[in-house]
Amino acid sequence: MTKKVLISTGGSGGHVVPAITIYNHLKNTHETLISTDIRGLTYLDKNIKAFVINTPKLNNYFLLPFSLLKICFLTVKSFFLLKKNNISILISTGGYMSLPLCLAAKILDINIFLIEPNMVLGRANKFFLNFSRKLICYSKNLINLPSGINHKLTTINPLIRKEYYETSKYQKHDNLFTIIIIGGSQGAKIFDKLLNKSFVSLAKQASIKIIHQTSKKNINFLKNFYSQNNIESKVFSFDHNLNEVLKQGDLCITRAGASSLAELSFLNVPFIAIPLPSSKDNHQYENAKYYKEQDCCWIIDQKNFDDQKFKKFLVELTNKSQDYMTKKNNLQKLNYQNTWNNVNQKILNIINEN
């Protein structure tokens, strides 16, 4: 009899993208369902039917009693959801959104598998670690991992969306050095204001093209900025075919979400990571550090950003320095065995293990 799987996710793309990837790995061999909160729905394909469990955050002390009461209610709702659908495996991608379903799964003695795409063990995953069957991550050197838990740890290649494996190699039709900026859906001052000054100077010394992802409110500002400074550019807020955009890049400047870095790495696009300083447990820095330690990327500290040094650094990269080529070659070596079939088989082996 086929095991029924429920994947619990929600919140940001950092949680939802791995969930979608796991869903696509399992949908042909298991009856697979997804649960998310309202925010997570925006990342899901309309063809995927999702149950909504809208878990409240626990960061407001004034509303804490109400939030805890709601979580109790959602745990009961999750209990009946799991029971009604005969779920035998729960896969959680972490985050506070997973609390009700993981609690209900524990009560029902359902096998729980945790996914940790970051290099720092998340708080929700850490809380449910003792209740789980396995913790699936990308490295054995996971930060904040409690002692005596190594037997639950199992590693896989980073989860990459299927369309990335099917992405054809980009054929350049010009001599422009293409820089892609991924500022996130909310945008950020350093991506939308500070970096631009460097591009103006760089454009006087090198032939460049900028592809800039930002928030909707900043699109017109950036389009006008690049136009006024005669810099060829494309500015956008969201693109369902981001893989087709990223493959055009000679270089990417990005935050350091686990999925973003894994996808850039897989497409062999050298990147400069500017970790979000306020990320929980500094996990974005640790994500980027994983690649830097393998000489696959550069890291810039946002708090100590130096415009003059950055301009000089970009000039070196546009000339495809030895350092640039080393990063590109190392990225290729890093992803040598990351194929859809290899990851698929590893996931199936993990969840089907007796």
Q: What label would you give each PLM region?
A:
Residues 298, 303-335, 353-354:
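Conserved donor-nucleotide binding/catalytic region of nucleotide-linked donor-dependent transferases
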Residues 2, 31, 38-39, 108-167:
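Active-site-proximal region of nucleotide-activated glycan assembly enzymes
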Residues 87-89, 231, 247-262, 269-270:
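Acidic donor-binding loop of glycosyltransferase active sites
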Residues 24, 35, 39-48, 165-252, ...:
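Donor-nucleotide binding loops and adjacent catalytic segments primarily
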